[in-house]
């Protein structure tokens, strides 16, 4: 990554300044082709730990390693030049202590080439966020539904559906803001609560299954493209294409051409040179 392309990327400070302004467009990418396709159209590319499910076929995000996340980030950074690339710290890479979290974050920035990291948790992670930001690590926070905590939560459960649940989540949002996070993802959260948090804090909120009032939105790219193993997506996803069908039809056509010996045709082969 050259110094020129680094300067061209959206910076954390410019993203923070978008609070209350034009909506921030975010998507995930784990590979060079997807990163290349979306780079000019989005503000943030999240190299999400959802790669464990989307790319590697796991049932949850938990199995993916930091080494593998860094490899995905390297591919995304090489194929992009405009968007801010944020690397999701995977489960087990940052929770054990402040120095542990810094070591993982340093690898994400130095080896992965990411411009920032994301970690899950509100008040319980505030000290970690403060420790990291004081040492030059830009942090995107993540509250609400926490995919890395599904074992203790008992599954993927939305939050803030009753007024009694609001206060702890508002406290989480305020805590990560005061700790120095430059933005916070609000996932799987009742719409009125997400809208209220967006009004209450001074950093951008990025919604996923939250509210149109958030300062930005994020989805898993393969979900909106209709490209998945199961074909199922969360109810908050709007599907903009059906690549499962498009790819399936293309491969079926290829297979038919091969079986009928229509492929390769003459234009797809190499003739002898004329002497």
Language-model segment annotations:
Residues 2-235, 241-275:
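Alpha/beta enzyme core
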């Amino acid at each position: 990554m050259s110094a020129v392309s680094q300067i061209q990327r959206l910076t954390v400070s410019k993203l923070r300044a978008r609070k209350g302004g034009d909506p921030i467009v975010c998507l995930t990418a784990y590979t060079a082709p997807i990163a290349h396709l979306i780079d000019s159209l989005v503000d943030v590319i999240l190299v999400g730990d959802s790669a464990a499910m989307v790319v590697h076929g796991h049932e949850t995000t938990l199995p993916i390693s930091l080494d593998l996340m860094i490899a995905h980030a390297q591919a995304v950074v090489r194929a992009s030049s405009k968007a801010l690339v944020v690397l999701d710290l995977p489960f087990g890479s940052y929770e054990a202590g402040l120095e542990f979290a810094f070591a993982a974050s340093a690898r994400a920035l130095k080896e992965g080439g990411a411009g920032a990291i994301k970690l899950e948790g509100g008040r319980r992670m505030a000290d970690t966020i403060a420790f990291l930001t004081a040492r030059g690590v830009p942090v995107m926070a993540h509250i609400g539904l926490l995919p890395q905590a599904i074992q203790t939560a008992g599954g993927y459960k939305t939050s803030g559906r009753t007024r009694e649940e609001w206060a702890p989540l508002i406290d989480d949002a305020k805590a990560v803001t005061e700790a120095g996070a430059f933005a916070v993802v609000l996932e799987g959260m009742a719409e009125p609560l997400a809208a209220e948090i967006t009004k209450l804090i001074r950093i951008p909120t990025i919604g996923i299954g939250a509210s149109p009032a958030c300062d930005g939105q994020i989805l898993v790219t393969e979900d909106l493209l209709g490209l998945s193993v199961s074909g199922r997506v969360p109810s908050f996803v709007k599907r903009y294409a059906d690549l499962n069908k498009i790819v399936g039809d293309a491969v079926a056509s290829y297979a038919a051409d091969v079986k009928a010996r229509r492929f390769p045709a003459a234009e797809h082969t190499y003739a002898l040179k004329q002497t």
